[in-house]
């Protein structure tokens, strides 16, 4: 199991959710991929 600190906690590293991005950062465990960061707007 891949354990990452917020905001890098995702149910699956290969299944992005239709969420707001803020911003696109390099994939923590795969430099060749990018992953949307969950925008924490309250």
Swiss-Prot record:
Organism: Galleria mellonella (Greater wax moth)
Residue stretches spanning the membrane: none
Keywords, comma-separated and alphabetical: Antibiotic, Antimicrobial, Immunity, Innate immunity, Secreted
Name of the featured protein: Proline-rich antimicrobial peptide 2
Location within or outside the cell: Secreted
Keyword Secreted: yes
Tissue/organ expression: Hemolymph.
Primary localization: secreted
Biological process terms in GO annotation: defense response to Gram-positive bacterium; innate immune response
GO CC terms: extracellular space
Protein purpose: Antimicrobial protein. Has antibacterial activity against the Gram-positive bacterium M.luteus (MIC=8.6 uM). Lacks antibacterial activity against the Gram-positive bacteria B.circulans, L.monocytogenes, S.aureus, and S.lutea, and the Gram-negative bacteria E.coli D31, E.coli ATCC 25922, and S.typhimurium. Lacks antifungal activity against S.cerevisiae, P.pastoris, Z.marxianus, C.albicans, C.fructus, C.wickerhamii, A.niger, F.oxysporum, and T.harizianum.
Reported induction: By bacterial infection.
